[in-house]
Amino acid sequence: IQIQPNYAMAHNNLGITFLELGEKRKAKSSFEKAIKIQPNYAHAYWNLHSLANDIDEALTILKKLYEFDNKYIKAKLMISALKAFKGKFEDFDTLIRSSESNHPMTRSIKWVFSLPKIPKIFFNRWDFFDAIVAQTDKTRPFYEFGVWNGISFKHLIKTFKKGFGFDTFTGIPEDWHNEPSGTYSSFGSVPKIKGGEFIVGKFENTLPKFFSQKRPLASLINFDADLYSSTLCALNYSNNVIDEKSILIFDELITNKNWEKDEYKALNEFCDSLSISYDVIAVSFYSKQVAIKLKK
């Protein structure tokens, strides 16, 4: 940006980085700068909608995008979803009979609207986290399976003061569709975060020992292991710290190309094995997060 201050893509990418770090104001400023430089920059509009305060604001941004780029499929799908959240299902009904009916976002939207109770929708991970945290028992610690560089952990520890994090810190232990093993590595660097206790290693090696001792009930558990196998392992071993007050967040449960084969599959197999169910309380199509409460 210093070399080319009017390079719209650079401002958009900077906004994505700020958003990943939780710097929402800076992210919004960067997306708006990209749009000012290049008014028909669809990706910047798409990212900007993630910072909307409500459905109406998100719809306004996405409709602007779709006016100049009606081939931006994600915008079309999100518009239909947001209208459905407002009780207007015409676009959604058309969508599920269209050529986009098997798009991963369409499948995600269909799943959400098949639920007994429609959950609340959020547009970015930080607003999602804050809304869920507000519903938790803050006297309890939180658990996170998949820490990576600790950005989410740092955000959560501000509220709970004590957290347990589990990760290899050398990346995912097996291939995840098109992502090779070792992706999302922090190169062995374990975060140093006050109040954080980090258990290093593969889940199948560390969780049996950790949970062989009585552990405090969870306020919140953030499942960010991506893999079906790792998520199922984490669910099985953390079951004893989950009760009716615990809220479970799955970081990438929906909208990925193969979402039904990953965290979603692990959650449903776990519940089926125990003959229990769950209530979905929040979703974010943009950040892919889903929050649930188990019905034990």
Regions found by a protein language model. Give the residues of each.
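Residue-level recognition of tetratricopeptide repeat
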Residues: 7, 41, 71-72
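Structural motif corresponding to the intra-repeat A-B loop/turn of tetratricopeptide repeats
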Residues: 21, 52-55, 86
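Conserved alpha-helical positions within TPR/SEL1-like repeat arrays
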Residues: 9-20, 43-50, 77-78
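S-adenosylmethionine/decaboxylated-SAM
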Residues: 138-296
